[in-house]
Amino acid sequence: MQRSADVSIGPITGLNYTDLYDSLPSSVSDNITLLDLKEPERVTEATKKLILKGCVETAYHHPLETDPLFASVHKHLPDFCHSFLEHLLGGEQDENSLIDIGEFFKLLQPSLGDWITKYYLKHPNKMSGIQIKTLLNQIINMAKAESSDTETYEKVWKKMPSYFSIVLTPLLHKVV
């Protein structure tokens, strides 16, 4: 894989967007531009989901924390995903309260009910790397901009960008 010029650009301070672009799976980078990473408001819902899934895959296959790529890309993935998911969900979020784990647990039952527990949702660091990756991909699959006047939106989706970042962080420190 050829590296692009070393330039840090975009709204997430310290994130090298060119390195991020180069780190994404080709199934993602072949279908987006560098500008798509820097300006989430310009891309479709499907492209946002594609980028988020690419970031989860990039986090899952992270280098050692001593690798320069970890410092320029991977450690910034939680903030980047927070921003992208916020755009996907409509831009409004609530940083001051926690996600309703019980409500979120119910939402996950059709897809992850065979293994997900409330304990795992409260303590994502206790999950294996593949479990975290599966949960994050399911959040992306379920995410969409919806009316802000629903109870589910208030209890779960309004708070999801922060929760997503919290769940993604332990993935960056797991050996897979």
UniProtKB/Swiss-Prot annotation:
InterPro entries reported for this sequence: Major_non-capsid_tenuivirus
Chief location: host cell
Keyword DNA-binding: no
Superkingdom of origin: Viruses
Pfam family, any one: Tenui_NCP
Gene Ontology CC: one annotated term: host cell cytoplasm
Coiled coil regions, renumbered to chain: none
Record's keyword terms, sorted: Host cytoplasm
Subcellular location: Host cytoplasm
The family this protein is said to belong to: Belongs to the tenuiviruses NCP family.
Role noted for this protein: Induces the formation of large intracellular inclusion body, organized in amorphous and crystalline arrays. Presumably the main cause of the stripe disease observed in host.
Name of the molecule in the record: Major non-capsid protein
Species for this entry: Maize stripe virus
